[in-house]
């Protein structure tokens, strides 16, 4: 009897200890333990710290680039014209009128021509739409524009006055006409032109015609020199068949021609 009682007591003790251990594991994780309660009495400091961390993380996420696609494109980008980097042509526009002038754009808005190419004559032509281009001075960072009175000037912002229609002529020159301004009764287009002294002409002038040399501009763009593409082809040499060497026959001594004897026939009669 004593052994059976001891065994029962031992088994009951094991069952109770196992049940208590299982209750500890099943307890909810959200309840703070005694160690946590002792470190942060009241829970106010922890909540404020967690709230501050959450707000700082949310602010960092919102300020990260690409977090809000709607913000992209606002700010300074809305006030300036963004052109595609592909298809840009950088160089100068040479007008063959007079002694020849390069179209140049000044930072103060002045537009004229210079015989010698300089920093002001470096232009950048970019496409706006099909057949429509814009012209920007690289040094002045201003756009070529034509007012409603036909006067050429430089604009700090890209507007409709800065749009020109580019046409290729048969003599390899280009003409640039305003895309929005033209003579209303006849519908004649207004062209970018320079006079013989290099001054800008008004596009509304009846003398400014696409057939005149004052409206012809030759684009001079710097193209990168590509390395010469070449390759070497090795042509296999045809092996010549070995020439058969004829055996040398020793030259025999020339045969002596035998002495020829002439026989005369003698006919005897009687």
UniProtKB/Swiss-Prot annotation:
Alphabetized PROSITE patterns for the sequence: HBGF_FGF
Effect on the protein upon substituting residue 95 to F: In long hair dog breeds
Biased composition (Polar residues): 75-84
Keyword rRNA-binding set for record: no
Region (Disordered): 26-84, 237-257
Subcellular location as annotated: Secreted
GO cellular component, one term: extracellular region
Subunit organization: Interacts with FGFR1 and FGFR2. Affinity between fibroblast growth factors (FGFs) and their receptors is increased by heparan sulfate glycosaminoglycans that function as coreceptors.
Protein name: Fibroblast growth factor 5
Protein's organism: Canis lupus familiaris (Dog)
């Amino acid at each position: 009897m004593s052994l059976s009682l001891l065994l029962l007591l031992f088994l009951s003790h094991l069952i109770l200890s196992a049940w208590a251990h299982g209750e500890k594991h099943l307890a909810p994780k959200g309840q703070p333990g005694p160690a946590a309660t002792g470190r942060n009495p009241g829970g106010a400091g922890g909540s404020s710290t967690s709230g501050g961390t959450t707000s700082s993380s949310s602010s960092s996420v919102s300020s990260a680039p690409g977090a809000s696609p709607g913000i992209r494109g606002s700010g300074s980008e809305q006030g300036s014209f963004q052109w595609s980097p592909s298809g840009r042509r950088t160089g100068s526009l040479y007008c063959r009128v007079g002694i020849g002038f390069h179209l140049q754009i000044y930072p103060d808005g002045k537009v004229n021509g210079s015989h010698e190419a300089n920093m002001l004559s470096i232009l950048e032509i970019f496409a706006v739409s099909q057949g429509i281009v814009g012209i920007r001075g690289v040094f002045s960072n201003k756009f070529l524009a034509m007012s409603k009175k036909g006067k050429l000037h430089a604009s700090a912002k890209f507007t409709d006055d800065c749009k020109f229609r580019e046409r290729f002529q048969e003599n390899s020159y280009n003409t640039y006409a305003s895309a929005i301004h033209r003579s209303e009764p006849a519908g004649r287009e207004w062209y970018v032109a320079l006079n013989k002294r290099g001054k800008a002409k008004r596009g509304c002038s009846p003398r400014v015609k696409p057939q005149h040399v004052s409206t012809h501009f030759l684009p001079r763009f710097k193209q990168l020199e590509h390395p010469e593409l070449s390759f070497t082809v090795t042509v296999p040499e045809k092996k010549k068949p070995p020439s058969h060497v004829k055996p040398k026959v020793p030259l025999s001594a020339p045969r002596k021609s035998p002495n020829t004897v002439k026989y005369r026939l003698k006919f005897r009669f009687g």
